[in-house]
């Protein structure tokens, strides 16, 4: 069953700290949320499921291909850089061209934040997968940070898929669940989210109603 999910695209500005009502320091991530526009509404009757497509970020119209130009023209909005579709049971409450701002969320609600994590480059198994590594002394010969065995020899004669090994780390889609919206600045379009959010400053983030939260 699809829940009533709210969502908004925005830009991560960075972290700071604020005081709460009990005079305790709270670390927060500041997200410049929206404004987004609704570019498509999917319904059960036509599409077999309910969702809403939102767009964010200005883009030069000359850089948009013809199919997307027609898609934006149908919604009567200017072309945008980023598009995302959110499954929600409340899709019928949205209309084409409707603007979505930070006011869609209230302080205290739980949210899931999705973004591309920071790229770390090529990393070994100790950094990438938290391996213990080899012995630091007592006969260890240049195996201190090696992964150890990666499988059998003639049987199975190959390395199984999913084997944790050294490789490119980060720069992948990550979702941090059940973060709390500490405060909303509707005038400036800011969301103050308690704790850390994936990705670098200036990165694109998607803030949605928590899938597992209360």
From Swiss-Prot:
Domain of life: Bacteria
Name of a matching Pfam family: Ribosomal_L3
Keyword Nucleotidyltransferase part of the UniProt annotation: no
One CC-aspect GO term: cytosolic large ribosomal subunit
One GO term (biological process): translation
Segments traversing the membrane: none
Any one GO molecular function term: structural constituent of ribosome
Keywords carried by this UniProt record: Ribonucleoprotein, Ribosomal protein, RNA-binding, rRNA-binding
Gene3D superfamilies for the chain: 3.30.160.810, Translation factors (2.40.30.10)
InterPro entries per UniProt: Ribosomal_uL3, Ribosomal_uL3_bac/org-type, Ribosomal_uL3_CS, Transl_B-barrel_sf
Function: One of the primary rRNA binding proteins, it binds directly near the 3'-end of the 23S rRNA, where it nucleates assembly of the 50S subunit.
Family, per entry: Belongs to the universal ribosomal protein uL3 family.
Quaternary structure annotation from Swiss-Prot or TrEMBL: Part of the 50S ribosomal subunit. Forms a cluster with proteins L14 and L19.
PANTHER family: 50S RIBOSOMAL PROTEIN L3, LARGE RIBOSOMAL SUBUNIT PROTEIN UL3C
NCBIfam families, A to Z: L3_bact
Identification of the protein by name: Large ribosomal subunit protein uL3
């Amino acid at each position: 069953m699809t829940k009533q999910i709210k969502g908004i695209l925005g830009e991560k500005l960075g972290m700071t700290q604020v005081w709460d009502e009990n005079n305790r320091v709270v670390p927060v991530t500041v997200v410049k949320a929206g404004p987004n526009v609704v570019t498509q509404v999917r319904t059960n009757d036509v599409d077999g499921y309910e969702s809403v497509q939102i767009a964010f970020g200005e883009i030069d119209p000359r850089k948009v291909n013809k199919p997307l130009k027609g898609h934006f023209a149908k919604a009567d909005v200017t072309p945008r850089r980023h598009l995302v579709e959110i499954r929600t049971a409340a899709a019928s409450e949205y209309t084409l061209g409707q603007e979505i701002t930070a006011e869609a969320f209230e302080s205290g609600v739980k949210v899931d934040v999705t973004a591309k994590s920071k790229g770390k480059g090529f990393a070994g198994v100790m950094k990438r997968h938290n391996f213990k590594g080899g012995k630091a002394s007592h006969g260890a010969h240049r195996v201190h940070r090696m992964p150890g065995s990666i499988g059998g020899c003639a049987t199975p004669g190959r390395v199984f898929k999913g084997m944790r090994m050294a490789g490119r780390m980060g720069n992948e889609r990550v979702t941090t669940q059940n973060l709390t919206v500490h405060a909303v600045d509707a005038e400036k379009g800011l969301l103050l989210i308690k704790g850390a959010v994936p990705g670098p400053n200036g990165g694109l983030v998607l803030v949605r109603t928590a899938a597992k939260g209360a």
